[in-house]
Amino acid sequence: MGVTSYTHETTTPIAPTRLFKALVVDSDNLIPKLMPQVKNIEAEGDGSIKKMNFVEGSPIKYLKHKIHVVDDKNLVTKYSMIEGDVLGDKLESISYDLKFEAHGNGGCVCKSITEYHTKGDYVLKDEEHNEGQKQGMELFKIVEAYLLANPSVYA
């Protein structure tokens, strides 16, 4: 098994605590409201496993994440994608480490480290990461637009 890591930073005018609440703490409720392709998000067991189900006809049926850390004091979350169509037969898991920090005039910088844990001797291609990052940024931009349009939400 190999590991390929990528880092990324994104800035936004949204305060870090608001963005963390929206993207991490209340994502089970907010994401299905904002993204019609997401049917629902189910918590399993003690809540450390989250299953995101997609609507019928979507190219992705579901994704399952294991939540390792949600630190609302330091605005950090760590989780891994452990099941789902995205992993295919080449990936064991994908780990995410996100930190939300104050930046600029009340805004935020979101710093992420993504680690792809591959099966066997498979080497991840940059294009595969770029596609996943593109989809993640689409979600980020949708939530950002919602928070900008609704300044009292998660305030």
Curated annotation (Swiss-Prot):
Locate the transmembrane regions by residue number: none
Question: What GO CC annotations are associated with the protein?
Answer: cytoplasm; nucleus
This protein's encoding gene: STH-2
What PANTHER family does the record point to? OS08G0374000 PROTEIN-RELATED, PATHOGENESIS-RELATED PROTEIN STH-2
Gene3D superfamilies for the chain: 3.30.530.20
Gene Ontology MF terms in the entry? abscisic acid binding; protein phosphatase inhibitor activity; signaling receptor activity
Its ancestry begins with: Eukaryota, Viridiplantae, Streptophyta, Embryophyta, Tracheophyta
Alphabetically sorted, this entry's keywords are:
Pathogenesis-related protein, Plant defense
Q: Please give the record's induction comment.
A: By wounding and fungal elicitor.
Q: Which domain of life is it from?
A: Eukaryota
Per the similarity annotation, which family is this? Belongs to the BetVI family.
Matching entries from InterPro entries are given as:
Bet_v_I/MLP, Bet_v_I_allergen, Plant_def-hormone_signal, START-like_dom_sf
Q: What is this protein called?
A: Pathogenesis-related protein STH-2
* Listed GO biological process terms: abscisic acid-activated signaling pathway; defense response
What organism does the UniProt record list as the source? Solanum tuberosum
